[in-house]
Amino acid sequence: MFKKSMLLSIQSVLALLVILAASLMPTWAAEQEPSVAWEKIDRGVMLIDVRTAEEFAEGHIDGAMNIPFNNIVPELAKLNITKNTEIVLYCRSGNRSDMAQKSLVKQGYSNTYNAGGFNSLISAR
């Protein structure tokens, strides 16, 4: 009897841990869908190109502002961007926008989307 109730308790705790872990999955795990990104961009959300100034000058999405990924947190703070502002980030491949997004989420920004790479976005348009 004791073994059975102990086993049931362990199973319950494990099930609770799985549910908790699933709810804490990063928001960027299923992102980088160009169609979703374009829907957001077309709605006029804040669009940030996190590539270098040189890459930005070579071409960018209309309406995007350029903030290199390693400056994203202090620059948004300087601009007084609220932490619930809807923000779409992109770079060349999706890696730097992922790093920028993680930095923003860590600082409490709750409405960010990693749109992935510039070329993928342009080809999907």
Tell where the protein language model's regions lie, with residue ranges.
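Rhodanese-like catalytic fold shared by cysteine-dependent sulfurtransferases
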Residues: F2-V45, E54-E86, N95-R125
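Structural scaffold elements adjacent to functional motifs in cytosolic proteins
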Residues: I48-D49
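Short, surface-exposed ligand- or partner-binding patches at beta-edge/loop junctions that are enriched
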Residues: Y90
